A protein has these predicted regions:
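Nucleotide donor/acceptor-binding cores
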Residues: 19-21, 158-159
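Extracytoplasmic "Venus flytrap"
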Residues: 22-39, 59-64
């Protein structure tokens, strides 16, 4: 996951008004990322002396990840939290995060993200009028199914697996023998109920 910010918001020196930034994401209010964003808002208020705050829109209220990126580009949104898959269509460097088993350990993963390579990737969207601010760790890749345990890649053969809308994710699933089915996070529950995905 990444935090991205629009180039369109500005802070005028000497202005005493509270600057309210609009932030949107697709996760429910109970999700740990949303709780982290609430904490971030409290810190923003504290560190700005009450001159800045955020209105946080969860559960894809303002649209899908791609729609939030588009809102960012036109200045209708100040900050969004999206997956790297949503950014692949804007900047090729984000495709690296879809490659399975790329990093040897969590330590190496964070070493890369916190270093010069991670900073270059965050900045790679600048030609598209937004910039990455920070990375969120969403944990290891996991597969969950309605009625079958997945212990090895071979267990994915023949299953309809929900993937993000990412060419890398689709190709990975094909390599594992599963049927890749791109579904937005907000539509996943319905897709499972209607057997669109397993």
């Amino acid at each position: 996951f990444l935090m991205c910010v629009s180039f369109s918001f500005s802070c005028k020196e000497g202005v005493k008004e509270v600057r309210v930034l609009k932030l949107a994401h697709g996760l429910p209010p109970s999700h740990s990322v949303h709780l982290g964003l609430l904490y971030m808002n409290e810190r923003l208020k504290e560190l700005s002396g009450g001159k800045m705050s955020m209105d946080i829109y969860s559960s894809a209220q303002l649209g899908s990840e791609n729609q939030c990126i588009e809102l960012l580009q036109i200045g209708s949104l100040d900050i969004t939290k999206v997956s790297s898959a949503a950014l692949e269509g804007f900047a090729d460097p984000f495709k690296v995060f879809g490659i399975p088993y790329l990093f040897r350990s969590r330590e190496q993963f964070f070493e890369v993200l916190d270093g010069s390579v991670g900073k270059q990737i965050l900045g790679s969207t600048e030609p598209y009028w937004f910039r990455g601010l920070a990375y969120f760790d969403s944990g290891a890749r996991s597969f969950y199914t309605v009625n079958k345990q997945i212990r090895t890649p071979e267990d994915l053969k023949g299953l309809k697996i929900r993937v993000q809308k990412s060419p890398i994710a689709v190709e990975m699933m094909k390599t594992f023998g599963g049927s890749a089915t791109p579904v937005d996070w907000g539509e996943l529950y319905t897709a499972l109920q209607s057997n669109v995905v397993d």
